[in-house]
């Protein structure tokens, strides 16, 4: 029985021993397996792969071999084509792909076949970036080893022949020592551009086929070339392979480059050097241009090329004279920014579908003979639109005229934006025969001449349609409630509304301008306190800041009223002299002649019924002509015009101006013909008199018009809102005076593309719906938009019509365009937004920014743009060499002054893979700092917010608040919470007040406080702190963190290696102990078994008590 018990005990102990041993063995195997897998995966990561060519005649040809895991192998030719060869050649520094070879053309390799079914797009940077079956996976033998033939370009040449100079002619290419031609199949201007650029012959003017420059001989090297125009050499375009074609030499292609074309442009048969029929010199002969599609964009390019930068009109068959000879160009289509007419799209040279009765012409201007004005509206910012071109004056026809066009006029005249546009009623008997027709402005142009499709001249217009405008800067004054027309309460018209002016907002200089504008002479007195009675309605809340020399009140600067509100009891009034615009005419000198007055804009002779020497003496003094010598009768200086003023002056002779004399007109008798006042003054040779303004106005031009005003329109008609930049956001349209949204029904990339194009934001990356950028307000203007993508404006697309929809604002449409840009700093801590790798969002993707040329000024721009601080540091680059990320831009160099990174020069946008060592890593200064302290952990508390540094008010400031600041700055604990500007008074905003921290907050702005910037404190109450420690710089803290991480990683590897070694040693030791048992008896067996079981139990117990994984022995 005891023996049986011992056997059972023995078996039980053996089972426990085996279970414990198996547990340890499995763990050891798993660790080793994981480490091995990591090593294998790392070896396939890309850094240890190499590419070479073997068996070829030179370094740029041979069998393709790839080195993976320190072992060279070949590539199978399945799917092997020119796109793949392009990648191989470029990767090896032999940029031109010549031929794709297979079937062991360069002899069969040996060893591994690493890749099969390789498929490239052609733009990959390495062969292993292309798709393939997987490393070592294939279904071929070495008899299918792939090869390539590349070229570094040294053995390739190109030229143009048979054209008379090196920049035009038949294209010929030298390859393998033989010259050959290019087939014209699919040959276009893109191919010609590559050829001209490669030969340094300027831009491509034209291309030709059908052996236009004669048939060549020898090989035909290329056929069906596909170029995008950006390639550096013709052989870098996609093609089927050298020498592969289905042509003969009757299809040889040729090109004409700008430097070889001898192209010139001129105008003939015009009235000026900047107008007439257009003619182009091509291949030594002058010819004309057909007017098919001829518009203002084409004319703009032609005028600019001729040195007459403003296109007045594009002339077609109606006005241009007929030329002779060739018609060189037809269907010209320019964008308007081209520098030469032949850079625009057009048919091939000499191909046309018209006769000389359709010859195109232009009327251009150098700008000196163009004038725009508003007339008859009470100020220079309102009235009928008049245009003067080359001394010819005309009106603007109201046909197709709207608020967009009016807005351009107002802006061009410095009159703000358009408040309204209307038509002016005139009788047909006073009609003008000269008209300006404007068919399309977008509202953003700087001048009317920049609008599209405007024509000048002889087309008819209904004479009830003269365009009239009122601009926002229009201010028309009047005097109301006075005894005479030139005195009274000042009232000013803004748009259609009249209002009074507060006496504190109107100076003597402003009164002087008002009197001059009203043709009322000079100011006599300025009266406040509603001297001429209280007005009603609007009181304008603006101060007139005139200097006194302005001709109109609307030309004076205005500013918001500085003293708050005003009532009608303070309406200002003015008394003007009225009669100071007076002159002598028809005399032999400026100091003698017939007396004429200007009253309310009209000049007329003064009746002599009450004219005497006292009046004459004041006038001579006023005109600086000495004293009056005589007042001859009988109209010795002529009778003058029909207008004779009957006003009677009652001067005493002591007044300085005629306006100071008493004047009466009431009841004055009629003046008979010839009864006009005259005077001869003594003269004063030391002074001269400038002639008075002799202009007259036609009373009929002041006829009141019947106006159909409409709501103001802003300068923009389309915008993107709440997207973080001008090229992303909710789409909003301005229509009928209101901004509104677009419904997302049927909204797609074609629609979004039109929006992006219209806003000059590139192309559409995403067409968002469901109010992705938040719900808008106001009208929903458009629904079910269906664009084809070619429209220039979103409202040109098909839709239900303005305001017709079945949506709500939760369906507001939005877009993200390719030119939308954003900025961020990426760190391992997702909550850290002011330190990390610098990335920009562009063209729909995030990419890093290179560290080349990165300066503190650039870092400061980044930190300010992100709202982090006004400065920062360039952090050490990441040491991780296994990661490659896309980089967008490098060599950013910000000068002082830019607000955003987008304003700084850099290298061009170019997306490429970059290692972390090439990227920019930035640490912005903390949003909180201590100033004027004895250490960097004491001082006045300042916070970065809203783009500037500001202070914290000491109301409620205590040790808990200081504790948060010290912890946030890494300065230990707070020793003191300073008050009353303990470290001096700061400047700028006081950002926070009534801060009430508990003491455990992460940052000061996590504490309760008043709203940002709302404070009733002065800087004498600036808060401060004194902390217990001197803080390490943020950079050193990051360095310490990285060093700790590296040290911890090394320690972990060493510990793991020791553990594995210990486990292996333990297993071997137990095996030796088990062998010794067989010779040691039962007691030894039992002791070993119990010791093993006890060890397993203690290890398990230790694991449970030690969650950190510390496997130290428990005593």
From Swiss-Prot:
Glycosylated position list = 105, 139, 936
GO MF assignments? virus receptor activity
- What is the disulfide pattern of this chain? 76-140, 89-150, 120-130, 183-247, 196-257, 227-237, 290-354, 303-364, 334-344, 397-461, 410-471, 441-451, 502-566, 515-576, 546-556, 607-671, 620-681, 651-661, 743-807, 756-817, 787-797, 863-924, 894-904, 953-1017, 966-1027, 997-1007
Supply the InterPro entries for this chain.
SRCR (IPR001190), SRCR-like_dom_sf (IPR036772)
Chain coiled-coil ranges: none
PTM: A soluble form (sCD163) is produced by proteolytic shedding which can be induced by lipopolysaccharide, phorbol ester and Fc region of immunoglobulin gamma. This cleavage is dependent on protein kinase C and tyrosine kinases and can be blocked by protease inhibitors. The shedding is inhibited by the tissue inhibitor of metalloproteinase TIMP3, and thus probably induced by membrane-bound metalloproteinases ADAMs.
Distribution of this protein across tissues and organs: Expressed in monocytes and macrophages. Detected only in one population of monocytes (CD163+) which is in advanced maturation stage.
PROSITE patterns, sorted: SRCR_1, SRCR_2
Name the PANTHER family on file. SRCR DOMAIN-CONTAINING PROTEIN
Q: What is this protein called?
A: Scavenger receptor cysteine-rich type 1 protein M130
User: Which parts of the sequence belong to the SRCR domain?
Assistant: 51-151, 158-258, 265-365, 372-472, 477-577, 582-682, 718-818, 823-925, 928-1028
